[in-house]
C-alpha cells in the first residue's frame, strides 16, 4: 500500500499489517512512487481526494492529485514493466444520467466546467481516458471499475450515510429537510460486497 494517510490511518488496517507492506508517500511524488513500484506485478490505483465538500473547497487539489496521480502511475508502470493496471473511477463520471439504472454505455460528461463540484468527476473522466489509450499501447490488462458510494466500518463521519445519521439524531423528532421529492434513489455498496465484486475482476 502506497498512501500519504491524508484522510486515512494505518491503524484502520492494523489487523492486516502482517499481510501487507505499507509505504508512506504522495502519489504526486514521481520518485517515491517509482521506488514503491519496483518488483510489482500489478497496480490498483485508488488514490484520490474524496468527499463532496473538498470538490467545492479544494478543486485545484482534487485535479492536481487526479492528473499528476494518473500520469505518475502510468509512467511508473511503464518504467517498471508492470503490465496490469486497475483504475478506480466513479459514478460521478455520469453526473445526471439519462436513465436509471445506468449502464456503462451512458455518456460521460461534465455539465459545467466552471462549477468546482465537477473537479472530481472531470478528473475521473481524464483518468479513464488516459487509462484506455495508454492501456492499448503499454498494458496487457487494464480494467476500469466505477464503484458507487462504498460504505462500511471506520469510514469516518464526513460521508453521506454517517452525515445523515448524525443529522437525524440531532433533530430530536423534528422534520428532516431534504432536497427533491423524497423519491430520488442513489446506489450504495457495502465494503465487503465491493471487495467480493473486485476480487472477480482480478
Predicted feature residues:
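N-terminal Rossmann-like NAD(P)+-binding domain of SDR-like oxidoreductases, especially those catalyzing
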Residues: 1-150, 172, 192, 198-202
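Short, solvent-exposed loop/turn segments at secondary-structure boundaries
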Residues: 57-58, 154-158
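Terminal helix-turn-helix DNA-binding modules in bacterial transcription factors
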Residues: 168
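Flexible, nucleotide-binding loop/lid elements of kinase catalytic cores
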Residues: 174-176
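Catalytic Tyr-x(3-8)-Lys segment
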Residues: 180-184
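A conserved structural motif in NAD(P)-dependent oxidoreductases
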Residues: 186-193
Amino acid at each position: 500500500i502506497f498512501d500519504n494517510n491524508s484522510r486515512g490511518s494505518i491503524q484502520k488496517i492494523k489487523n492486516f499489517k502482517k499481510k501487507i507492506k505499507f509505504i508512506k508517500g504522495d502519489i504526486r511524488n514521481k520518485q517515491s512512487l517509482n521506488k514503491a513500484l519496483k518488483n510489482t506485478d500489478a497496480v490498483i490505483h485508488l488514490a484520490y481526494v474524496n468527499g463532496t465538500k473538498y470538490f467545492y473547497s479544494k478543486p485545484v487539489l482534487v485535479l492536481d492529485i487526479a492528473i499528476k496521480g494518473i500520469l505518475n502511475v502510468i509512467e511508473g508502470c511503464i518504467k517498471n514493466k508492470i503490465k496490469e493496471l486497475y483504475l478506480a473511477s466513479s459514478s460521478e463520471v455520469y453526473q445526471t444520467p439519462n436513465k436509471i439504472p445506468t449502464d456503462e454505455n451512458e455518456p460521460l460528461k461534465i455539465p459545467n466546467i466552471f462549477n468546482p463540484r465537477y473537479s472530481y468527476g472531470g478528473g475521473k473522466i481524464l483518468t479513464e481516458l488516459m487509462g484506455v489509450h495508454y492501456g492499448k499501447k503499454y498494458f496487457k490488462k487494464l480494467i476500469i471499475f466505477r464503484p458507487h458510494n462504498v460504505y462500511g466500518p471506520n469510514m469516518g463521519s464526513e460521508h453521506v450515510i454517517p452525515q445523515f445519521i448524525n443529522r437525524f439524531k440531532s433533530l430530536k423528532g423534528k422534520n428532516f429537510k431534504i432536497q427533491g421529492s423524497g423519491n430520488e434513489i442513489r446506489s450504495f455498496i457495502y465494503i465487503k460486497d465491493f471487495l467480493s465484486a473486485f476480487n472477480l475482476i482480478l
